[in-house]
């Protein structure tokens, strides 16, 4: 079973973020298929881009970095070529590796864009009440998913504007407006027992004639 510690240089750099995962070798010349965690691959995967690797301690790539030489698309699927990865054997040894990078210091911040490390740990509010804490962010082609730890378990929340309308990193909070069924509904206040509920069996309510 793979256990992949986050590289030390990434742990020390709160601005670092995941951009992809190497899935499997492609062909015989060292190419590797990619699963992208970014919606802007043309910006992140440029020739010369350097990535830190999240791999097991036992991996021959542990503690090393990868430099991209070229990104190609085959049948709408991204395939990367990297320095020092010359054949299929080397490419196969990189399967499951997660790619991390640090944005340039002069890169302007994007509106309504957050890195994983900014979201993890945020308190999740629903109608002003804290319902859980973000523990993980999953990236998928269609949308990202927030793992929200609640007292009753983990809930997966689609990270879309309609469901997560507000993120306040400085305040440490994230507001959700989930659809019915995503979270357990808060039970309504129990109705006050009617006067007839405490009546003795067979007795008639006050004011009513016995029949």
Curated annotation (Swiss-Prot):
Family label: Belongs to the RimM family.
Residue ranges, annotated region (Disordered): 184-211
Protein's recorded name: Ribosome maturation factor RimM
UniProt source species: Clavibacter sepedonicus (Clavibacter michiganensis subsp. sepedonicus)
Domain notes: The PRC barrel domain binds ribosomal protein uS19.
GO molecular function: ribosome binding
InterPro entries: PRC_barrel-like_sf, PRC_RimM, RimM, RimM_N, RimM_N_sf, Transl_B-barrel_sf
Domain PRC barrel: 111-182
Free-text function comment from the UniProt entry: An accessory protein needed during the final step in the assembly of 30S ribosomal subunit, possibly for assembly of the head region. Essential for efficient processing of 16S rRNA. May be needed both before and after RbfA during the maturation of 16S rRNA. It has affinity for free ribosomal 30S subunits but not for 70S ribosomes.
Name of a matching Pfam family: PRC_RimM
């Amino acid at each position: 079973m793979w256990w992949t510690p986050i590289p030390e240089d990434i742990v020390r750099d709160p601005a670092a973020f995941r951009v992809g995962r190497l899935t499997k070798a492609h062909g015989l010349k060292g190419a590797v298929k990619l699963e992208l965690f970014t919606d802007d691959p043309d910006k992140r995967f440029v020739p010369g881009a350097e990535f830190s690797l999240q791999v097991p301690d036992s991996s021959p790539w542990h503690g090393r970095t990868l430099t991209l030489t070229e990104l190609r698309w085959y049948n709408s699927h991204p395939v990367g070529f990297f320095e020092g990865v010359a054949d299929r054997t080397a490419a196969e040894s990189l399967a499951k590796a997660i790619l991390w990078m640090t944005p340039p210091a002069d890169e302007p911040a994007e509106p309504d864009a957050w890195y994983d490390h900014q979201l993890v740990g945020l308190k999740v509010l629903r109608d002003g009440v804290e319902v859980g804490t973000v523990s993980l962010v999953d990236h998928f082609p269609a949308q990202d998913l927030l793992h929200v730890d609640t007292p009753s378990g983990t809930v997966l929340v689609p990270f879309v504007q309609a469901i997560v309308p507000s993120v306040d990193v400085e305040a440490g909070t994230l507001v959700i407006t989930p659809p019915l069924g995503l979270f357990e509904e808060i039970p309504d206040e129990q109705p006050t027992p009617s006067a007839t509920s405490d009546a003795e069996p067979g007795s008639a309510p006050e004011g009513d004639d016995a029949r």
